[in-house]
């Protein structure tokens, strides 16, 4: 799949996550009725996670069989507009009347979601397949979807708020739709960036591969405070896997995830806990965009907490070519794509960019050696997801290899473990270098990097603050630090002189004497003449 088609597909999963649909195959077993839902369920069968892991391992040793695509000539015509008119009847929600607290509704197949996904209700260690029926959906009389076979299948699902709430039918908080994508509304009740089960060869030669979640097992708790547990089987041309998601609805959403991954073929780039987002432009590169809004992005930076304890912040870019940045680490403490800028006036858009969630990946246990990789893809519009971040283990993902990882995803407004003893990057501002009143050289770029936080607020008035700046190439000059007027922030100012078209890697942080005051700001400068 090309980068262009990939980005359109990924973005569509988020757009459609605001419409309703349903998901599994027609059960061939003796049917039963789910409580108060009208859903038809198959006969119960024993289920355990380790049995699912064993199935994934066995699948990796066999030839890949793609998920079913019923009537592809019909499904391809169910475009975004047509798909949005197909709505699942919420009265048929799984657990709408209990015993589980969090009802599930399902997505219909469509142009961007052509593969069927089997759905199971899980309770007491017994799984029952949920049979698909077109009667679960409302659709226009002339909908092309009416031409699909009655045994088609579902595309995905979403979880609703507790059925103890009177508004649960219109309020959802998690959606799984398309390949292995999923997303949540975070703590600000707004969908934005997404995660995936796995990323395969995102920037490797030969094109990216998108394995699919092919089966879901949904186990909703009966008691408040307990998680919704989702089990998933993953399969693709080069990999198979089994996943367990324990999803907790807190002030945001917290997911405890365990995965077992088995390689069917060699993979050059295996991405664990991949995050996908959109960055079109921000205050520091709007000069290259034409739009009435000051900023347009779902996330504005990659934050990292290294195994050595260093805090890093890398503002995102919209480059002129595909760029992959690797940050080598061992046993990382966390990383995430964040939306730090929460000021509405910085966006001025009714689609709530100021409320888009941040997602933080917190490894559980030791992940060993590897690298956090950031992929930035050129885009000329907000409809394309063009940012990807994931962990790539040092261990080769060769045929026959296996991996097991545990991690926690925090979907909220900010990172879950901020450093009180370290100021954070508040803003990155970029302009023409040189001195006022003199000709401005084309190969010089001026940076203003603002920092904010307790260590700066607590400085004595006579404190001397210094910026430690380094560059991979080129020259640093006109270095200056000062308090930002009318605020409690500090900023570092400096010029970067470049001598060629190659990207320049920059690092900067603030110190006072022997005390480090801030996280490390990192930036990739792409000279543009």
Q: What are these model-predicted stretches?
A:
Residues 1-2, 8-30:
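N-terminal export signals
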Residues 35-80, 89, 107, 346, ...:
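Terminal accessory/anchoring regions of large secretory-pathway or extracellular enzymes
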Residues 63-204:
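Solvent-exposed N-terminal domain segments of exported/luminal and surface proteins
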Residues 80, 114-116, 154, 213, ...:
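Extracellular structured ligand-interaction cores
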Residues 81, 174-177, 186, 268, ...:
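A contiguous, surface-exposed recognition patch within enzymatic or periplasmic domains that forms
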Residues 123, 134, 232-236, 249, ...:
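A mature extracytoplasmic/lumenal domain signature
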Residues 194-250, 365-380, 384:
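Extended, loop-rich substrate-binding clefts of extracytoplasmic carbohydrate-active enzymes
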Residues 232-278:
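Acidic, contiguous internal or C-terminal segments within carbohydrate-active enzymes
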């Amino acid at each position: 799949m090309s980068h262009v088609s990939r980005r359109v597909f990924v973005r569509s999963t988020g757009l459609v996550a605001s419409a309703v649909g349903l998901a599994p195959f027609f059960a061939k077993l003796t049917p039963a009725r789910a409580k108060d839902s009208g859903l038809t369920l198959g006969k119960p069968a024993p289920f355990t996670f380790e049995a699912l892991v064993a199935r994934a391992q066995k699948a990796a040793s066999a030839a890949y069989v793609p998920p079913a695509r019923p009537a592809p000539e019909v499904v391809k015509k169910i475009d975004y507009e047509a798909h949005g008119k197909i709505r699942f009847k919420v009265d048929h929600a799984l657990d709408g009347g209990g015993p589980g607290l969090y009802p599930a509704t399902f997505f219909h197949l469509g142009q961007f979601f052509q593969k069927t996904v089997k759905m199971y209700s899980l309770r007491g260690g017994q799984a029952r397949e949920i049979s698909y029926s077109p009667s679960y959906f409302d659709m226009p009389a002339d909908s092309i979807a009416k031409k699909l076979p009655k045994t088609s299948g579902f595309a995905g699902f979403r979880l609703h708020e507790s059925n103890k709430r009177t508004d649960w039918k219109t309020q959802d908080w998690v959606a799984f739709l398309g390949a292995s994508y999923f997303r949540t509304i975070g703590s600000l009740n707004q969908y934005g960036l997404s995660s995936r089960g796995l990323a395969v060869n995102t920037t490797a030669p030969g094109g990216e591969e998108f394995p699919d979640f092919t089966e879901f097992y949904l186990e909703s708790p009966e008691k408040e405070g307990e998680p919704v547990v989702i089990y998933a089987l993953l399969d693709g041309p080069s990999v198979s896997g089994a996943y367990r998601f324990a999803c907790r609805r807190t002030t945001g959403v917290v997911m405890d995830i365990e995965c077992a991954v088995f390689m069917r073929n060699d993979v050059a780039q295996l991405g664990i806990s991949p995050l996908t987002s959109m960055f079109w432009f921000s205050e520091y590169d709007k000069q290259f965009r034409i739009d009435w809004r000051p900023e347009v992005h779902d996330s504005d930076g990659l934050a990292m907490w290294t195994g050595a304890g260093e805090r890093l912040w890398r503002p995102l870019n919209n480059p002129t070519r595909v760029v992959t940045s690797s940050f080598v680490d061992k046993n990382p403490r966390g990383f995430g794509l964040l939306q730090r800028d929460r000021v509405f006036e910085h966006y001025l858009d009714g689609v709530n960019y100021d409320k888009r969630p941040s997602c933080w990946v917190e490894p559980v246990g030791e992940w060993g050696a590897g690298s956090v990789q950031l992929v930035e893809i050129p885009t000329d519009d907000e409809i394309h997801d063009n940012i990807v971040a994931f962990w790539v283990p040092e261990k080769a993902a060769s045929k026959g290899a296996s991996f097991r990882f545990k991690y926690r995803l925090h979907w909220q407004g900010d990172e879950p473990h901020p450093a009180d003893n370290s100021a954070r990057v508040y803003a990155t501002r970029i302009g023409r270098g040189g001195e006022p009143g003199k000709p401005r050289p084309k190969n010089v770029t001026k940076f203003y990097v603002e920092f904010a936080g307790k260590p700066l607020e607590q400085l004595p008035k006579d404190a001397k603050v210094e910026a430690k700046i380094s560059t991979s190439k080129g020259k640093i000059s006109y270095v200056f630090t000062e308090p930002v007027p009318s605020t409690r922030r500090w900023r570092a100012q400096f010029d970067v002189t470049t001598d060629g078209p190659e990207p320049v890697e920059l690092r900067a942080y603030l110190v006072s004497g022997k005390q480090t005051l801030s996280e490390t700001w990192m930036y990739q400068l792409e000279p543009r003449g």
